[in-house]
Amino acid sequence: MLDDAVQPIAEFQNLRVTFQTKSGEVIGVEDLSFQINPGETVCVVGESGSGKSVSALSMMRLVEFGGGALAGGQLRLRPEKGGQLDVVNAQPATMRKVRGNDIGMIFQEPMTALNPVFTIERQLVEGLKLHLQLGQGAARARALELMKQVRIPEPERRLKQYPHELSGGMRQRVVIAMALACRPRLLIADEPTTALDVTIQAEILSLIDRLKQETGAAVMFITHDMAVVAQMADRVVVMYRGRKVEEGPVDQIFQAPQHEYTKALLAAVPRLGDMRGTSYPQPLPLLGAKAQAVEPIIGSDAPLLKVKNLVTRFDVSGGFFRRTVARVHAVEDVSFTLQKGRTLSLVGESGCGKSTVGRSLLRLVEPHSGEVEIDGEILGDMSAADLRRARAKMQMVFQDPFASLNPQMTLMAQVAEPLRSFGTHKGAALQNRVSELFDQVELPRSFLGRYPHELSGGQRQRVAIARALALNPQLIVADEAVSALDVSVQAQVLNLMMGLQANLGLSFLFISHDMAVVERVSHDVAVMYLGRIVEIGPRQKVFETPQHPYTKALMKAVPIADPAKKQLDRDLQFKAIPSPIHALDYIPEPSVYTEITRDHFVLQTHCGY
């Protein structure tokens, strides 16, 4: 008999999962077999719809709550107390104890994993009391310890907050803390770092790896990011359309992939450094197709958007009468210029103020002070009617198209909405314009009568881009527009955006935390930290000769799609993020910059890093 230490913690044997739909039976997973050993990280990689998440939910017996059925095969788990659990035939009461204690799960979308009506403290403490039988005081102390472990600033204050009060990155850190709370034997991580900044991602990956080493836990890591696979995996399982197409040690998968799909997946990964020596954006390679050669998108020297000393603050209420007791300094003294037909990328961690800058430009959030000028018009001086007219020149593409599109309206109605609102097109002209927009974003016109839920994530984002283009804007603010998409779909959408820029002369303010993507699409880059721009300049200069210590830390944190270049714990020395909340009488120092080379500026004012 095998020694207990080398027996697998989890086994999938010929797993088959089906879903019943109006059109009949749909196979989610077919004939899937692999095992996960103690202290091992198995990365399950593939695109949306490949069956990665379905296989993980099957081991948790959660797939049945989503309409799935375990139609064949075996699932086995070895709990901490010993023995072997037949997961397929386990009773619901048994599985309730297993979830949390023996299997912890980190979900991709933290807003759906957290309860919006309970505080963070209540949600963390509830699981600790249930599974570990801790008292209220001990559970709260453990919750605080977990919050510190996942590097959440001001953890005591965050415990008292609700999920909607935290940024996306902070919410995901809370979900990770909840999954780690009971020190599970098997940790299932379903795209846990997809929407996180590179520094936080590097730390979370390091944290999961350290937990694995300390406890001997096994990790089933689900991702579509091959760079993350290179950093985390001992073994890799590649899935495509519900089936396993390749399995092997991580070095073998990267150095000598056998299946065509694995080769194509590796080819589509944007790698930091690929753009070295080039000044202008370039398209990404597409799965199964050669990228078409395009002329460099040079743009113009004529300024479109000028931002001077932009400051945005939010009041913090407290006390019995809910008076303003402090302010969040979200954006502090930000200035930049964006030329026509060019892309300026804002990069930085969650909470650094990059999204607030984008919203402040469109006055979706009212700035505290500063000046925003678009095409010679100053937005701050405008009446409501003039602002509405000016907004036709500026449009926004949000991170989650499922949230920004109305689930009850057809795609035709949604793309036509801005045209109707501004009265630019009617009747047949309206229909023709919407059809043209679908052609521009490379969607079939047969989709016009469909609803958002009938499309994939990449297709929904194309609809969001079509709606943003409806009024022929000059500026598009793309707020994490591709961060939640698969690598091949992301490449398609980015190439689409670059093609539209070349053809229509659009300017993009591209807000992102993905440095490899930013390197591909940008003419210029501004790095933000705690509300300030710490470094700004041409993309080639900022990426090839970074000057500010924070920019260097960001570059160092980017995972590289090469198992031989794994990041070590000692390389990841990030400083805790200071609080952006200050007293009402606090007066920040003005931003002072040094010009290193032409148009390459670095902040000299102390910014907390």
Which stretches of residues belong to each language-model region?
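Conserved ABC ATPase signature
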Residues: 161-166, 170, 451-455, 459
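Short catalytic/signature loops enriched in Gly
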Residues: 5-8, 84, 153-157, 250-306, ...
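Conserved ABC transporter NBD signature motif
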Residues: 70-85, 370-378
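Conserved ABC ATPase "signature" region
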Residues: 138-157, 378, 428-446, 555
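A short, proline-enriched helix->beta-strand linker immediately N-terminal to the Walker B motif
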Residues: 181-185, 470-474, 490
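ABC ATPase NBD coupling module
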Residues: 81-104, 130, 252-257, 320-325, ...
